[in-house]
């Protein structure tokens, strides 16, 4: 997540354009030219303000940086043997990742802003992969709570 935030900061314009097109809903027309063949029944959802689009992108980057920092702390906790703390911190960080990719990109971007209808500016497949990876990691982290002999972890 920290690398993702770093990439979005150092190559700000590329992904800002992505966010702008998704929020503006100007390519939700199944591959037609931008602005053509748009569904008038849903275009009221579009956010056309460049200020709001950029603010949204900055919030995404901030969320990525924060979730990355939480996960980095959890890695340090795992490495220093603070198992219970690491599990709790990992859970928070992974839930933040799931909230961003599933809640933010698939639900809000994909469904509310109809990102799935765009042939050029859709990120639903990538968001799905990231959501599933974070979910499986979360499950793996939580399964470690019960030791093989059935005893509960005592941890620090």
Indicate residue ranges for each PLM-predicted region.
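N-terminal signal-anchor transmembrane alpha helix
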Residues: 1-22
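Generic structural signal for short, flexible, solvent-exposed coil/loop and linker residues
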Residues: 8, 12, 41-44, 54
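Extracytosolic (periplasmic/ER-lumenal) interhelical loops and adjacent juxtamembrane/interface segments
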Residues: 20-51
């Amino acid at each position: 997540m920290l690398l993702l935030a770093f990439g979005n900061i150092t190559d700000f314009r590329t992904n800002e354009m992505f966010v702008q097109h998704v929020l503006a809903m100007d390519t939700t027309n199944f591959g037609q030219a931008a602005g053509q063949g748009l569904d008038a029944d849903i275009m009221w959802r579009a956010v056309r303000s460049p200020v709001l689009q950029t603010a949204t992108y900055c919030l995404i980057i901030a969320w990525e940086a924060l979730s990355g920092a939480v996960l980095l702390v959890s890695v340090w906790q795992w490495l220093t043997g603070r198992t219970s703390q690491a599990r709790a911190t990992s859970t928070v960080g992974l839930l933040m990742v799931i909230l961003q990719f599933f809640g933010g990109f698939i639900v809000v971007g994909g469904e509310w802003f109809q990102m799935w209808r765009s042939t050029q500016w859709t990120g639903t497949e990538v968001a799905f992969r990231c959501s599933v990876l974070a979910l499986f990691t979360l499950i793996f982290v939580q399964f470690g709570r019960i030791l093989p002999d059935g005893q509960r972890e005592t941890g620090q």
